[in-house]
Structures are given as C-alpha cells and as structure tokens.
C-alpha cells in the first residue's frame, strides 16, 4: 500500500524544519573545474570538503575514476588571484600549480611530486608544444611574475617539459607586450601561436586582442592582430584540424562564434545569445571543435544555458534536448562525444559525457545526491520586471517549498534578495543548496541578474559602466518591489545578501534606501578609493570603467562609498570576512563595522582566519550559514527549527524583536 499523504503543519515562514542542514550544505559543496580530455581520459579538479576544501586532480577512463594528485597537493593557481587552468596532463606525467607556493610541480605516474619552477612565479593555462626531433617537449604557459610584488608582470613563457635535474627555471619569455595575456593556442602544424591580450584599464570582457605569431626556436616572430580592440571582447581562440582559427567575439553586441579567413572574420550561426562568459578564470571553454566540420557550442539565453551542434561551413545549428540549465568547461572526447560540467534544476552539478547523435548524457561524476526530495526543491522561475528609467531587469524567483509545512494564513514569507559578485557574473537557475537552504525553511529567494550581469549581451553587461552602486541597487530594489507588489513577499521582512561586488551592492542598498530590513555583507567593498589602491593587479583598474578613473573621478568615488553614507544605515547588518582575502582586504569590512558600531547601528561581525576571497573550509561554510539564519531569525522575529550557535548582534535590543 502507498503511504497516505500527511497534512502539512502550519508554521511561521522561516521556522520550518529542513532536512538540508548547514553541515549537509558544507559536505555537499563540491565544485568541478578545468575539465579537459587528454591521453584518452578525462581530467578535472574538484574540491574535497573532508580535507578542508583542498582541490585535487582526478581522472576518468576505462569506466573508473582515480585521484591523480596525492592528499596535500592543493591544485590551484593564483594567477589573476582567481586562477583556473592549473594543470596539464602529458602522457604519464602531469604538471600542476601548488597553492601553497605557486610553483609548478611535476608528477609522474606512481611517483612523488617535485617542484620544477622557482618561487615567486605563478603559472596557468599551459599547453604542450610538439616534441621536435632529438629535443624535449615543452610547455607554453601564462606566467605571473611576483619577484617584485609592487610591479607584477604577466607574460607568455616557454618551459622545457623534460627538466634535467628537476629545474626548469622561470621560463623563456615569448611575449611581454601587454598588461595581460591568456589562451595560448597552437596551430595544428605547430608553427603558429594564437593568444589573447589586453591592457589596463580594460577587463577582458571590455576589450581584448587576438594575435597570431610564428613560433620558432628563437621565440615569437612579429605578432599580427587578427581581431579585437578596445571596444571588442575576443575570447577562446581554437584551431581546427584544417588550420582555420575560430574565436568568440561580441562585435555584434553578443558573444558569438567566428572563423578567421582571408576575407575577414565570418560569423558562425549568429544569434542574439551569449556564446561565452566573462573571463574571470583561465581555461573557460564554451565551444569545442569536433574535427569533422562541426562544433558543439554552449549558449546562454535569458540566463539559461543550452548546447547545440553547429555545421561550421553551412552555419546551421541543431539544439540538443538535454535536461540541464547550466554548462561549463566543454571538452572534446572524440568526434561523436563531448563532456561538460552540467547543472540541472533538481540535481547537483555533474560531469557528463554527451553522445552528440542521440543527445543522451551519461554521468561520469556527480557532486552528490540531491540534498532534498524532488517535492522539496524550489524550482527557479525566470522573471523580467521594470526597473528605473524604463529599463527591464531579470532575476530568478524561488518560492518557499517544503511539503511538510505551510505558512500561517494571512502572512507572506520573508524575502532574501541575492546579489551575485563580479559584478559581471550571472545568477543561474541550476540547483544550488545555498538557495534551497532558505526556501526549504520558508524563506523566498530572488537571485537578481541586475544591469551589469553577463548572459544578456554587451549592452546589458555595460549598463553598470559609470553606474556601479546605482544601476545594480536600482535593479535589486525593483525586483523586491515587484515581488512584494505581486504578493509573493512580506514588505516588512526583506533582506539582501551578497559577496564581494555583491557585498558592495548590499552596503549601498542599506545605506541609500529603506526597502530592506536586514542585510548580509560577505567581504564587500566599503571604501571605493581604498579598493582601487589596495587590490591586486588584475582588478586594479576595474573600477575605472565601473565608476571612473582616478584622480578625475575622486568625488564620485567618495559619493559611492558606503563609508560616506553612514547616516543612511538604519537596519541590522551582518558582516562576514576572510582574514586572508587579497581581493577585498579585511580592512574594508573592519572599517564599516567600526563605523556602524560607533553610530549604534545593530551589527554582527565574524572574521574567519585562513579564509580568502570566498569561503572554502567546511567549518566556515557551516558557521557562516548558521550565523546568517540566526541573524534573520532575530531581526524578523521567527525561531529557526535548527540548533544554532549564539550570534551577538551588537546594538539590537530584545524589544525590537517581533
């Protein structure tokens, strides 16, 4: 006999008991990256929560998965601080960047890792050069030189892969003619090297250049500009087997695929959708060439990803019917199969192998079982809503969902507005335990793709230029008002939460509007001038486009800094910060906390030792999630069902609790 359905318990929103604990959220926080095919196998990196979030290299072949690097080998590069493309597999040998010292290590099958580059240099995005007669194979890598920390240099270098005595040196410089360089890609005949460059103050989603140069024993000869410029973002160069160079450009207003030719660049299957994402990390791959005149491309439309098979000569495409809403790290297995990291609405991220002919996907590795039963998962609902000055903005709305509970009649749920980082990142509808943590407890969530987000074209992405702290705040406020106006949220119990650039938006919104009644700032910016002065090279001129260049725009920096709007803070603030954050240093959080304390604004502050830009340790993830839940419970007057550690909110009188 089937079980009889139980009658849902009536309980206040926010107080519902959820099977998704903070501990389960931390244990299931596995992320996959740098997926690539090599040597007839798939390789990727994933963080291991049981080892404090340490990142290990794994491979899959012959139906089995194996860990390649030993425990303790933390495979992460800090080039640009955000890293990516931290390893390369060559036959029975892998080379990887070790987080602790940023040196390249050589690991032969069955052997012990040994460093092959000196300290004070960082490496990423390495490719293999073909072995010439009687000579060793070599690597070409992006190198970041930190021998003089005040003048960091980014170059392309050549390293010998067979390193007598274990020492490669720092590498032979091939190209040093730009502030930044990425995507070194070798032509099939081994004679030409394509690569992407850009200079301050541009970010790679603003303007880059695709260059090609002849590669000789003496180095690179006279790089030639193929595409790009200060107002065109070119990414992901790839050579086809016939020697054709393909790349992605946003010259049409959307990142689309192009083929280089004698008559100029030719668009391939042009559409008003995005075929790429901002280059925050090395090694991003949003299309693969199959070697038979076809490519598999990933494109994003209204924030939802799809895959299509494209005929490169005819310019036609066929979408694949797959049960996923997010794809990344596309890689070729063979002419009939590709692999990707895929996310779905009701299952956690997986590495999947896709049969192109049938459209069938086979799971290679999963981040774990779904944290909730299917009927307990809140599905993302895309919403478009009016914002300031006639703009239309976008978001994903998640309704409170727990079959064991229903809200008290006549009440509406609290609403948590999430603000992604970047600020050019993108909210995705794929299942995230961090969202379901709230919805399964009776708290509605809106994940906002404010103006400046990627996934909606260049114009939408540039809507934040000169307007950071304005457009993003307007759009998040508009999302909340839209949901309150459609009776999906309690206007008196609205909160805002974000990290990094999203944390800055949180602070501005709290200091300049009365829409929110609580806010959580995770390592956000409080002083714009200090950010421009103190941050790392990659982002050191980012704010030039978002606000303006210094010193000309000093008055705007001052007006956009939350530290200069302290009188506007009226509601409780929770601040969470990593003590070792090189992107947004801890003094950004400490200064705003000290200022709020001095003005008796209710504030709670937690500084996490050993954490950087984004939390990785399970104990930190657990504590920060529990603290945020306790914070909203105190402010909004509901009692969470969880057993939570005490949280001190300085300046919040008990009498203020509802």
Model-predicted segments: where are they?
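Non-catalytic accessory segments flanking enzyme active sites
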Residues: 31-34, 45-46, 54-55, 66-67, ...
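Active-site-proximal cap/loop segments of hydrolase catalytic domains
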Residues: 448-658
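Short loop/turn segments that connect beta-strands within beta-propeller blades
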Residues: 61-63, 108-111, 160-166, 215-218, ...
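Conserved beta-propeller blade repeats
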Residues: 27-38, 74-94, 120-138, 176-194, ...
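Cap/lid segment of the alpha/beta-hydrolase catalytic domain
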Residues: 147, 201, 367-492, 499, ...
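A flexible loop/linker signature enriched in serine peptidases of the S9 family
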Residues: 46-56, 75-81, 96-104, 118-123, ...
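Beta-strand-rich domains and repeat architectures in extracellular enzymes and scaffolds
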Residues: 10-60, 74-88
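A short beta-strand motif characteristic of beta-propeller blades
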Residues: 19-26, 66-77, 112-117, 170-175, ...
């Amino acid at each position: 006999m089937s079980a009889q359905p139980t009658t849902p318990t009536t309980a206040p929103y926010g107080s519902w008991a959820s099977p998704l604990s903070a501990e389960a959220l931390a244990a299931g926080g596995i992320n996959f990256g740098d997926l690539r095919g090599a040597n007839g196998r798939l390789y990727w990196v994933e963080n291991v929560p049981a080892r404090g979030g340490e990142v290990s290299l794994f491979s899959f072949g012959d139906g089995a998965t194996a860990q390649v690097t030993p425990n303790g080998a933390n495979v992460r590069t800090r080039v640009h601080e955000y890293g990516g493309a931290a390893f390369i597999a060559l036959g029975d040998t892998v080379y990887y960047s070790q987080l602790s010292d940023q040196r390249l290590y050589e690991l032969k099958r069955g052997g012990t890792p040994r460093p092959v580059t000196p300290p004070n240099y960082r490496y990423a995005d390495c490719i293999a050069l073909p072995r010439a007669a009687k000579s060793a194979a070599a690597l070409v890598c992006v190198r970041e030189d930190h021998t003089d920390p005040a003048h960091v240099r980014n170059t392309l270098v050549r390293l010998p892969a067979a390193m007598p005595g274990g020492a490669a040196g720092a590498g032979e410089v091939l190209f040093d003619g730009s502030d930044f360089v990425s995507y070194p890609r070798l032509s099939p005949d081994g004679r030409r090297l394509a690569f992407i460059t850009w200079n301050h103050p541009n970010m790679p989603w603003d303007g880059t250049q695709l260059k090609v140069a002849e590669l000789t024993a003496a180095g690179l000869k006279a790089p030639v500009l193929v595409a790009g410029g200060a107002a065109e973002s070119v990414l992901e160069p790839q050579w086809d087997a016939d020697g054709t160079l393909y790349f992605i450009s946003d010259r049409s207003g959307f990142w689309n695929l192009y083929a280089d030719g004698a008559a100029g660049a030719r668009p391939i299957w042009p559409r008003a959708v995005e075929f790429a994402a901002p280059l925050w990390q090395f090694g991003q791959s949003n299309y693969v060439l199959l070697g038979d005149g076809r490519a598999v491309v990933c494109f994003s439309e209204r924030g939802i990803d799809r895959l299509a098979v494209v005929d490169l000569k005819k310019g036609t495409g066929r979408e694949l019917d797959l049960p996923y809403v997010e794809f990344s790290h596309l890689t070729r297995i063979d002419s009939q199969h590709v692999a990707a990291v895929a996310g779905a609405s009701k299952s956690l991220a997986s590495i999947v192998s896709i049969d192109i002919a049938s459209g069938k996907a086979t799971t290679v590795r999963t981040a774990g079982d779904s944290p909730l039963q299917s009927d307990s998962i809140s599905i993302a609902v895309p919403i478009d809503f009016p914002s300031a000055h006639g703009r239309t903005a976008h978001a994903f709305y998640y309704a409170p969902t727990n079959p064991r509970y229903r809200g008290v009649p006549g009440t509406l749920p609290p609403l948590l507005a999430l603000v992604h980082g970047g600020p050019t990142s993108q909210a995705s509808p794929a299942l995230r335990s961090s969202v379901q943590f709230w919805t399964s407890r009776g708290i509605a969530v809106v994940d906002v793709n404010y103006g400046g987000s990627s996934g909606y074209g260049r114009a939408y992405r540039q809507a934040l230029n000169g307007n950071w702290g304005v457009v993003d705040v307007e759009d998040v406020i508009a999302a909340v008002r839209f949901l309150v106006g459609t009776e999906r949220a309690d206007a008196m119990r609205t909160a805002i939460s974000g990290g990094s650039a999203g944390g800055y938006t949180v602070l501005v919104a709290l200091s300049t509007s009365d829409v929110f009644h609580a806010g959580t700032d995770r390592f956000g910016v409080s002083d714009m001038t200090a950010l421009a002065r103190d941050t790392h090279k990659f982002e050191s001129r980012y704010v030039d486009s978002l606000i303006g260049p210094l010193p000309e725009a000093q008055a705007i920096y001052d007006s956009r800094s939350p530290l200069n709007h302290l009188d506007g803070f009226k509601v409780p603030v929770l601040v969470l910060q990593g003590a070792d954050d090189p992107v947004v240093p801890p003094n950004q959080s400490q200064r705003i906390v000290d200022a709020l304390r001095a003005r008796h604004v209710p504030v709670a502050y937690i500084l996490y030792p050993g954490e950087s830009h984004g939390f990785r340790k399970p104990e930190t993830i657990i504590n920060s999630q529990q603290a945020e839940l306790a914070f909203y419970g105190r402010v909004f007057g509901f009692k969470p069902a969880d057993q939570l550690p005490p949280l001190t909110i300085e300046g919040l009188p008990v009498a203020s609790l509802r």
